[in-house]
């Protein structure tokens, strides 16, 4: 019995809610017919509302109002307009994906999210490169294995986001890639981030030609590092006190017996 009463209560509540919704819709439709579609007085607003709610047996006024509402609907409703907008966005994204390959598939969502979080002001469009550097930081450096894509990454971002002309940056990137092509292949994006003077670059090239990759693979042994920590500057002073190669040779000529007896031990 309690369940039946609870069910009846819920039905009454739902019925009242539906009735209020229907009354609101009928009032809106009849008001539109009475005051916007025809001249005032041609359609009675109260009679139209009662017929719409089903409280009157006749439905002539309501039928007339429905016909007027059907005729007054736009040729392209809001839903159709939204569908056209969505289709246009899809076409644009398809064209971008076709033009730039997998770049938009890989980074498109990230760029859109960053644009929503940090919109570009009109007065900041002139400084497009600085804005891109602040927004994306070292994001494009992760793509170092793709070669030419890394060299033109900032130009591609400027073109996609519409921040301005990128001809100057293209020329600059081409020069930098031609000069550091060999270093980029060997070290990836590591050497590209270091700014060195011409003198240091020449010395590095000479060392590279002379020793190749040997000095990079072979470092100081662990025992030498332990001695360095333990004795500090004592080893440096001891090394300075050692004779040079020329002094050692003259010393060996003057004292041949010691040289024969101890060999090269006395040199150290």
UniProtKB/Swiss-Prot annotation:
<keyword id="KW-0968">Cytoplasmic vesicle</keyword>
<dbReference type="GO" id="GO:0007268">
    <property type="term" value="P:chemical synaptic transmission"/>
</dbReference>
<protein>
    <recommendedName>
        <fullName>Proenkephalin-A</fullName>
    </recommendedName>
</protein>
<keyword id="KW-0555">Opioid peptide</keyword>
<dbReference type="GO" id="GO:0005576">
    <property type="term" value="C:extracellular region"/>
</dbReference>
<feature type="disulfide bond">
    <location>
        <begin position="33"/>
        <end position="65"/>
    </location>
</feature>
<feature type="site" description="Cleavage; by CTSL">
    <location>
        <begin position="111"/>
        <end position="112"/>
    </location>
</feature>
<feature type="site" description="Cleavage; by CTSL">
    <location>
        <begin position="216"/>
        <end position="217"/>
    </location>
</feature>
<feature type="disulfide bond">
    <location>
        <begin position="30"/>
        <end position="52"/>
    </location>
</feature>
<feature type="disulfide bond">
    <location>
        <begin position="26"/>
        <end position="48"/>
    </location>
</feature>
<dbReference type="GO" id="GO:0005886">
    <property type="term" value="C:plasma membrane"/>
</dbReference>
<dbReference type="GO" id="GO:0030425">
    <property type="term" value="C:dendrite"/>
</dbReference>
<dbReference type="InterPro" id="IPR006024">
    <property type="entry name" value="Opioid_neupept"/>
</dbReference>
<keyword id="KW-1015">Disulfide bond</keyword>
<dbReference type="GO" id="GO:0001515">
    <property type="term" value="F:opioid peptide activity"/>
</dbReference>
<feature type="site" description="Cleavage; by CTSL">
    <location>
        <begin position="112"/>
        <end position="113"/>
    </location>
</feature>
<feature type="site" description="Cleavage; by CTSL">
    <location>
        <begin position="215"/>
        <end position="216"/>
    </location>
</feature>
<keyword id="KW-0165">Cleavage on pair of basic residues</keyword>
<feature type="compositionally biased region" description="Basic and acidic residues">
    <location>
        <begin position="166"/>
        <end position="176"/>
    </location>
</feature>
<dbReference type="GO" id="GO:0031628">
    <property type="term" value="F:opioid receptor binding"/>
</dbReference>
<feature type="site" description="Cleavage; by CTSL">
    <location>
        <begin position="219"/>
        <end position="220"/>
    </location>
</feature>
<feature type="signal peptide">
    <location>
        <begin position="1"/>
        <end position="24"/>
    </location>
</feature>
<feature type="modified residue" description="Phosphoserine">
    <location>
        <position position="252"/>
    </location>
</feature>
<dbReference type="InterPro" id="IPR000703">
    <property type="entry name" value="Proenkphlin_A"/>
</dbReference>
<feature type="region of interest" description="Disordered">
    <location>
        <begin position="162"/>
        <end position="185"/>
    </location>
</feature>
<feature type="propeptide">
    <location>
        <begin position="218"/>
        <end position="228"/>
    </location>
</feature>
<keyword id="KW-0732">Signal</keyword>
<dbReference type="GO" id="GO:0007218">
    <property type="term" value="P:neuropeptide signaling pathway"/>
</dbReference>
<dbReference type="GO" id="GO:0007600">
    <property type="term" value="P:sensory perception"/>
</dbReference>
<dbReference type="GO" id="GO:0043025">
    <property type="term" value="C:neuronal cell body"/>
</dbReference>
<dbReference type="GO" id="GO:0043679">
    <property type="term" value="C:axon terminus"/>
</dbReference>
<dbReference type="Pfam" id="PF01160">
    <property type="entry name" value="Opiods_neuropep"/>
</dbReference>
<feature type="site" description="Cleavage; by CTSL">
    <location>
        <begin position="133"/>
        <end position="134"/>
    </location>
</feature>
<keyword id="KW-0527">Neuropeptide</keyword>
<dbReference type="GO" id="GO:0034466">
    <property type="term" value="C:chromaffin granule lumen"/>
</dbReference>
<keyword id="KW-0257">Endorphin</keyword>
<keyword id="KW-0597">Phosphoprotein</keyword>
<comment type="similarity">
    <text>Belongs to the opioid neuropeptide precursor family.</text>
</comment>
<keyword id="KW-0964">Secreted</keyword>
<feature type="propeptide">
    <location>
        <begin position="197"/>
        <end position="208"/>
    </location>
</feature>
């Amino acid at each position: 019995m309690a369940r039946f009463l609870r069910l009846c209560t819920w039905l009454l509540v739902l019925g009242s809610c539906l009735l209020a919704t229907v009354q609101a819709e009928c009032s809106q439709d009849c008001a539109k017919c009475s005051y916007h579609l025809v001249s005032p007085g041609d359609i009675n607003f109260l009679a139209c509302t009662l017929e719409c709610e089903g409280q009157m047996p006749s439905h002539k006024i309501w039928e007339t109002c429905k016909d007027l509402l059907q005729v007054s609907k736009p040729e392209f409703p809001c839903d159709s307009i939204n569908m056209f907008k969505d289709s246009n966005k899809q076409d644009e994204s398809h064209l971008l994906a076709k033009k730039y390959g997998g770049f938009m598939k890989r980074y498109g969502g990230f760029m859109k999210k960053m644009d929503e979080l940090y919109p570009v002001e009109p007065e900041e469009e002139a400084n497009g490169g600085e804005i891109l550097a602040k927004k994306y930081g070292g994001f494009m450096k992760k793509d170092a294995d793709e070669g030419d894509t890394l060299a033109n990454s900032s130009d591609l971002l400027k073109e996609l986001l519409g921040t301005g002309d990128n001809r100057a940056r293209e020329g600059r990137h081409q020069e930098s890639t031609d000069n550091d092509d060999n270093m980029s292949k060997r070290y990836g994006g590591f050497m590209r981030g270091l700014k060195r003077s011409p003198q240091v670059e020449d010395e590095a090239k000479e060392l590279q030609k002379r020793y190749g990759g040997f000095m990079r693979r072979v470092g100081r042994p662990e025992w030498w590092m332990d001695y360095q920590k333990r004795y500090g500057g004592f080893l440096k002073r001891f090394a300075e006190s050692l004779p040079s190669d020329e002094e050692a040779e003259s010393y060996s000529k003057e004292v041949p017996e010691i040289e024969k007896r101890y060999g090269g031990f006395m040199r150290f």
